[in-house]
Structure formats: C-alpha cells, structure tokens
Amino acid sequence: MLPSACPECQGKANLGFVGIAANPKEYHYHSVAEDRLVLITPNREPYQTLHRQGTSGLDLLDRPMILREENSGTRQEMERYLRKQQIDPDSMNVIAQIDNPEAIRSSVSRGLGVSIMSVLAAREYLLSGQLLSFELGDQGAYRKIYLTWRKDAQLSAAEQKFLAFVKDRHPVTAPE
C-alpha cells in the first residue's frame, strides 16, 4: 500500500511514484529522476518584460500565489528551498491552495496568480506559450522523484521485475 499521497490507491497498488521521501521507516524510496521547481506566471505583461530581463522567480514571491496543498511533496520541497534561501514561506501572499496541478496551471494562465511547480508539471503550458517560467535563484530548486514501496510489501513477480528494471536503469537510491 502506498503513502497517503494516493488514498484511492490504498490496498490496490504496491508500487508508486512520489516527490518526497516522507516516511523512510515504512517505505523504500528509489530515486529515479530529478525535477526543477520554477515560478510560473501567465504569458502576459508585466511578466513578459520581467522574463526578458532575466528576473529571478525569487523576486516575484510577493505576487498573489496559488500553491499546492501543504502535504504535497512539491509544496514541502518549495518551503524547504525557500527557508534555505532565508525566505519565510509564510510571508508569501497565498491566495489559494489547490490539490490539483491542472487547476493551478489553468488559474495561473488566466492571470489569477503565480505559482511554484515543477517544470515537468508545467511543461505543456510552457511549450504552448500559456505560461512563463522563472528560475528560483542562480542554483535553482530541485526535487527528486522516487519509486516507492512498503518495506513489508509482498511484491508480485511482475512488480519485482519492474522494480529490478527501474533499479537497473537508475542505480542511485535515497538514504534509508
């Protein structure tokens, strides 16, 4: 069974992908990818000018912000990164917390606010020109994507083969 990030999966799936290694006592986490967090805005003025000028996303944190819910991996990584930059996440002007990335992308593209999300999650809107992305500082903010499974799980033969396939292609894992 998977962590609470997927309540509808409880009892139905033994393997899953998550954005934070939240419970290493009960779950194995195997790192499979890294994803960059960026600040996204609608593709309109004044953001177009700021984008051309190379403005950092950190300079736009005072804008009305639409964020993921507090227990999301993206939100936790964003807050961790901001604290590391000496920025209090509670100082942001959060106007909405939404648990649906599509609703966040759509809201931002319509000009209702800005957000911080992963490049992978914003990719389609960025490629179609509906959104702009701003880097979060010189070194950027990153999160890992993990394959996860319970330590006490009895994996089927197919699940074990899939796990071996992933581990073969991504040999680095999260600390236990």
Model-predicted segments: where are they?
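Hydrophobic hinge/microswitch elements
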Residues: 1-4, 9-12, 87-132
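Short helix-loop capping/hinge motifs at secondary-structure junctions, enriched
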Residues: 44-56, 152-157
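Short secondary-structure boundary/capping segments
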Residues: 28-31, 56-58, 84-86, 123, ...
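Short beta-strand-centered segments that line the small-molecule binding cleft or hinge
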Residues: 2-42, 49-51, 109, 132-134
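A late-sequence structural motif
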Residues: 132-175
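Secondary-structure junction motif
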Residues: 48, 64-86, 156, 173
